């Protein structure tokens, strides 16, 4: 494809569409200024075009793939020409020729005509704007006022209202476009679709077609506009006959639908309809009159809730105006048009003398008077439009949790539930009239009532129970109706009490004449007590006014002899329901009733299991009530009863106990909501057993338990308790805070929690959201009531629609004022504190779900109103639709739609709209397809649920209806039909008979097998089939000890495993990995809907595979040896790693990664008994396969990240509150690490090779991740830390020796790599054990070098940092609570004592040999300061200073002289710190297991150090000189250094008092040390207390002993910053931007010749161009290079035409992969579920004929059973590209040998870990720097106190 000219710009980009291709089609493109056309490009079907504004992605829609296209232009250089000039002929072929070059002859033109056999065409026109024609072109007049005949009776004010109060915002102001007709086709055109406007207006205002003279005036106006270059459309045919309004409306609509695809798409006058955007699309409502929209960012972008339609880009969503500047971007059309118009007006050119492009039937007239009026009106009208566009809100009503306030819908419940209230009143009225139930006595009287009246009581009571049961299905509805019913009339309360007493009377039941009615009477009473007993008002009335105890009455019936089991269970259910209220629980637990003891007695005497189960549910419900009450009490005790202003230095034991109670209560509540939900219910016909095939759920029992939970939440103010805990995290332990977050997550996953937060605790919910998001205050906005517009985002649409045309001037004023308030405020609230990611995610989830409930409530109330307000419904549905445009908002919104049967709201709306359409068709013309925004939005939301909802409860409930809806898509208008056609592909698996039946899943497996062919085209049916299979095969996660285990899921897993399900799933994974081969280069594609589809396939596939593998390995234990899946799992992880961090499928990607890790951990299940089996264990083999797959630059970082995910995180862990849990966790943590170490030991060689290959890497992110993995490995056990230490030591020594003892860049990298590892306690202990020998000789020789180039300097700095860690006793495996001898602990934290003098000498020599201003000097002084911390090291340092006093004084003189003569430097502060450390003893830390320091230098010794012996005595003293320097540079000097210096001067001045003491004698020990550690001081004084005697240092213990004594737990704080206690620190690669904070060079520039590298690494016969195209998926099908089509798409996101027979897209991708698919064997029957293929088959798999021919061609001889042994690696790579699936189908189920790889790790070790940097840095995110400050700057290091939450995910 040739490029356009350098000066060419994009003049036009759009899509023309026609109904059919039975005739030649014509289209016209007009330009408002003369242009030279240089090139025309046709965009093939599915090709992506990216504009340079955000979200500007378009898809080509050209159809068919081949046709001839002619281009004609109006030559402005030949004004008298009678015909168009032929520009050229393009023989379009989407695989070859797609552009026409017109740059040879430049013809000035203002129009381009297309002529060809096509149905849809997407084209881009490039050219040059010009004014250089033979005659100047007249300036275009302003467009005429586009008022058609339907707008005649609209007043100016009402017209302004309709145009200004828009809901969809235009990003640029633009005049109303005028549609142009194709010359050969005459249709009726209107600038507005007024039939849609009148849909929202009342009938009495629709008088648009009554005056023929007004129509004629408009016709003349349209004709006159043809004089200008604006090219207004020709007039419609004159219609003088009368007609009805409905027929006129239909005629306009039908003609517009046909003609809209044929109108020309000029850049200025583009179509203003969008058939795809639900906010703009096909309105038959009052919001149709919108002007053209800004091309939104929602087209095939991350905010789209579903795949866009290709045919939808031919309207305003894809409108791309020609450019007025050199850049290749789109420009605001209003700016360009106004600038052009102004330029031409200033030029003053005469009237146009060239012939414009006119239609054949256009008539040119001139009425000068009317024309002047029209121009003025058009100018005024355009100004009004610009103002309306400026104030209009955005098209997508995005919900921003940080800016927008949460809303709650307060509808008129009394009106909404009036029908239920009237029904209840009617039933009680019947009871009072037809039965005499005033009292139990009267009813029980034998002669009081007739038999008919008694039976009538049963009939009417059962009807009442049915109505009450309907009310109880919704907690809010039940409470409101009963409260209104009992509050408004006390007679109702008395009557209900009487009826309930009669129903519960055993005597009254016995008075029933027939036995059946006796039973029905008792059941009626039990059911009525269950339904009415939960009302606290009625319960209190019975108890206080009538002294009637409901519990006593029900339990007395329970105690009656010979009571049937079913009635007993019904009575227990009534007792259960009556415990919903606080009054009921108090009465039940009162001494009078003593209900708890009574239930316990029943439990002891009960013989039937079902009775015991019902009784224990009552007990558990009471316990849950008590737990929630304790939460309220504990929060009051912590936050109200205590003085929070008093800081607590030590945790209060009482407070810890209180917080532990809160944790236990929250755990019980989460258990009740998830795992043990069934045990808290009273399900019907449920027999509790340990295992059962299927547990049938009881919706009534679930609703009853949900109502009880919500009632308990309200009674105990759960939201307030959550608020005070979340807002005061420092007042509670971190485990309590994290438990609170877990409870919030659990509540938001259930409809009970969402209903509670919205209906019962909304003000508190607002504050919780503010706390979670870190906002200073709750965004304020008045609550919305039904009579007012719902929120500021809804005001424009509501007002614009509800406004009537006759409201006059007030309407116009209100229209001008209110849009200014419509946009939400953009000022962000200040963030009080850094918000943790988990808190922010939780706040966003809560915001979206509460807001979704608000809109659902509004839709429900509005749809139920007598007046069906479509505008209001569409407004709220548009808001929900807007929420789905954001990935996180879409996820949370869809979750709410899938809960509690909320999708029924949209299904009912669709049914209602269908009925309305049928009525319209009966009244007007049958067969006409009407457009409705409500219907479009409802279908969109159902479609979003089908596409994105992972929970399938909605599908079980509405699947059949949705399938029928999708099948009948042709009955809807085109835009809705397009959505339903795509939805039909998703619903295809539901056509199988009983797809949700567990008995036989083979139809589902067949659907998945067939869908493999469309894996990368439109995989809707595959996604849905995998979701259904996951629903059948995987049970909900629950603890084994809870409830009944369902066997149906295991049964499905067995069926799938027997049907080669593992191979089928691996085939899916392989095809995806093959399609995204080298996934790093596919990052842009993974950002789009392709990535979403890939994750939607991958997630259920991985979950099902994990279930199958876990179950198979669990059953076969050590005999399972199949490693086939590991390769594919690792490749899938590599693909997932390269997803961009902010992609649409971010949450799903993280879930998929976790599933891969869990699947690999399933291989760790078998238990080996001996060492020999340990080396061949499945665990060890899994690790080997993972390590082998880290075999290339693209795999290094994701491979190490996967290894880090698999390994346990380093100790210590956060400490739990409970001591019992602490002991259990301690044993588990230790055993887990020992097992990992044992299974990794056989792979020690491979681990060492990996470290050797990657450690010298110049890529800092890779080195940093490898450091963390090495830390994880070394934390497991002593053998692993010795392995890592020896590997690094060998690397350092080998590198130094091979370079002839000259430091190299590679050595510098290795030393820098080792620096951080030596600061890790386990690795430090092993390094110290091997320090003696060549390792120390390396350090010594490096420090002795006097060449100070950059490499040597960096090496010496790294050595100093390593020695810093070695000498720091804070870095140690010893716990601060150790009870061992302090000197023994010290010996374990220091290098061997014989090396310490040599280390001191080497450091001091290096210090005196380097420049005093060098960084090495400060590091060396730092090490000398560390040596003063303990007596042993201090002694040897003092001895060295005594021996080398001259050198020390010379170095000191150089430091002082530099600061005196040159400039101030920090080295003088280092000198002061060293002198202070020598003369003063720091107070020991409060908790320390090391011996305290007792030795220091006195005044005489200090004088000997600082007084020069061989220098002129006339010079001032050293300390005075230093003081003078600090005073001179007071602004730069450190105040602490100045204070230390003054103390030194005072000490030096006191030397006269110590003249009598001996030289270098140590003074007495400080008193604080005496008190701190008397034992240490005594031992020092006993040894003489002198620097002449070396302190005692014992031999260090072994590494094994140190490991046993290391701390397992540490304390932490939820809000403190300690990243090492978070999982993110260990598992996320460090962002590349933070590397320089770790004293690492950001980049190393390493010379590399890519050509030479390619010649070395690649096969000379490799076709680089073809392989690159194949890898980049530039071909539509990877079948062969001959069929590669550079433009065909993969993962199509447009609308697909469904084949009637198969329901599949017409185009197929993998045609050649039908053979060798792996389904040759028939599936096993149900009776043979446990049959599987044996490990060794007698008939080996055959070699494919194509592969055999390929082997013969390259001269290889097939050997072995398959001939695969000799296949060259490059040929194997091409086989993968052919994608025949033979790698999977040829492998047996229990393959013993692993296939050879294209690349091996050995090929990468030679390069020394060269510079590799990923092509995409956006996915390198997520972790804090380890060295947020230099690790030697502070003293709190090592294994001290930690304060951070546990390993947060």
Curated annotation (Swiss-Prot):
Composition bias of kind Polar residues appears in 1671-1684, 1800-1818
* InterPro entries for this protein: VIR_N, Virilizer
* Ranges of Low complexity composition bias in the record: 1732-1742
Indicate whether Nucleus appears among the record's keywords. Answer: yes
In its UniProt record, a GO molecular function of this protein is: RNA binding
Q: Show the ranges annotated as biased composition (Basic and acidic residues).
A: 206-219, 242-265, 281-291, 332-347, 785-818
- What does the record list as GO biological process? cell differentiation; mRNA processing; primary sex determination, soma; regulation of alternative mRNA splicing, via spliceosome; RNA splicing, via transesterification reactions; sex differentiation
Q: Which UniProt keywords apply?
A: Developmental protein, Differentiation, mRNA processing, mRNA splicing, Nucleus, Sexual differentiation
Q: Name one GO cellular component term.
A: nucleus
Give the main localization category.
Answer: nucleus
Instruction: Provide the residue span(s) of the region labelled Disordered.
Output: 206-364, 783-818, 1557-1584, 1666-1686, 1715-1782, 1798-1849
- Residues annotated as coiled-coil are none
Write down the superkingdom of origin.
Eukaryota
Q: Where in the cell is it found?
A: Nucleus
Summary of subunit composition and partner proteins: Component of the WMM complex, a N6-methyltransferase complex composed of a catalytic subcomplex, named MAC, and of an associated subcomplex, named MACOM. The MAC subcomplex is composed of Ime4/Mettl3 and Mettl14. The MACOM subcomplex is composed of fl(2)d, Flacc/Xio, Hakai, vir, and, in some cases of nito. Part of a complex containing fl(2)d, Sxl and vir.
| Biological role stated in the UniProt entry | Associated component of the WMM complex, a complex that mediates N6-methyladenosine (m6A) methylation of mRNAs, a modification that plays a role in the efficiency of mRNA splicing and is required for sex determination. Required for sex determination and dosage compensation via Sxl alternative splicing: m6A methylation acts as a key regulator of Sxl pre-mRNA and promotes female-specific alternative splicing of Sxl, which determines female physiognomy. M6A methylation is also required for neuronal functions.
**What family, per the record?**
Belongs to the vir family.
Q: What is this protein called?
A: Protein virilizer
Q: What's the source species' lineage?
A: Eukaryota, Metazoa, Ecdysozoa, Arthropoda, Hexapoda
- Which gene is transcribed and translated to give this protein? vir
